[in-house]
Amino acid sequence: SDVCSSDLFKKFCAGETDISNGSRPIKESEIELCKKGGIEYIELPIAFDGLSVVVNKDNNFASCLKTAELKKIWEPAAQGKINNWNQVRPGFPNQKLGLYGPGTDSGTYDYFMENIVGKKVGSRGDYTASEDDNLIVQGVSTDKGGLGFFGYAYYEENKDKLKLLQIDGGSGCVAPSTATIADGTYKPLSRPEFIYVKKEAATRPEVKAFVDYQLAAANSKLISEVGYVPMPEDIMMLVRKRFSDGTVGTVFANAPKGSKVKDLLEK
């Protein structure tokens, strides 16, 4: 879970761990922490995940939301002002909007807000925040006007209780699926999942064996089983090369919105 990508990076940059998982790329502040700690790292995307935006099962008016509408709902200026569905789009009913999502410490929150509201902006504070996705499911499924978001895998587990929305990121309405997440057409809410490996630990046999296992083609079945979307083999070849070459630093931290993983790895 990404309950705290931030905490994991803090430990990693302090030299307490050899490998850190991240449900988002390393942040500028963490790059500085690692620099201070003298930690060089290899950045490896290992799978894709998409964020699902869901509404109550009985919602019969919303099927696709534009990213601009999501922004209107979640931006800080919406606090106490955008309270009903008809304020999101004329034609939607005058029904109370109930918002549910992960807390501000989570990688999922960061990723959603950066791509929907904007970098370093944050969100309105008057929503029901929980680090437990199950509580978000419960909230949306019992609130007729509910809307929430979390990882795609979690929607798959709970799809009988919720309605999945399509998202229009500028090229028409697209629903998240293993296909649209892997090929990047579900944007801007599909993302890579990472591991960061401490450079000086990368040659240790047990660390190398663990990373090789994570990057092996045979691992894609396991990735699917835990609810993520495997990366296409042409991308995984570039990731394996990055590890075997010991290429340090980040290409994802300041990548422009909507960048393709393959393009970044080929830089």
Language-model regions, residue ranges each:
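Flexible loop/hinge segments at secondary-structure junctions
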Residues: 1-267
